[in-house]
Amino acid sequence: MLPRYENKLNEIRSMISTLLSQIIRSSEETLHAFENSENALYESARNHLKNLQSDANRIDNEIIKTFALFGPEADELRLLVAYLKMTNELDRIGDGMRKYSKRLEEHSLGGLDLSVITNTIIQLHKTTLHALQYLYECLQSKELCDAEELYRKVMVEESKNDDLFSIMEKELLTLIITSGELSVEYVKVLGTLRKLERSGDRSVNIAALLLYAQKGGELHIYS
């Protein structure tokens, strides 16, 4: 591999890693705000993602320029395709986190009683956060990252995510049925929490893309 091309790949990987770190920071602060009822932190959490779209576009542009300048062969082409798709997944995760943070703030300020599902929300959020942290660790240590092991770890978190969401969905459906005029607010909460469920799916997609980049084979991702 040409040194200039390898340097460009490392630069793109670093840009993706930085974008992911901003999403993680936003997720951590949103979780802290919810756990500790620190409503002022929600806006701070979203500020980490204020340049999300432009940052993702800049990464895409670098990838496209690399395609054009270096004409990569099969293995390198596979890596660039994976990076391009990963950026799209991160953009969607970040956008989902921004909306989740905003809506969770609204639920908290609205005084809606979420006590019956508070612990489950926290655990659900942690599964999505752990998956993102595993992805970040892999991007930070290219030589040490075992993509197969990463995929297994992220799948474990996604499985926990699914189980927790199912539990919480049942609790919320009970609240929707029994809460009269507040039912519509609990429907909104259910929609908010689906953002975390989708984040888990997209984290699996990124792990699958890293596995594809490292090992090849068929690529299977959630739509």
PLM region spans:
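Cytosolic, long alpha-helical scaffolding segments
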Residues: 1-223
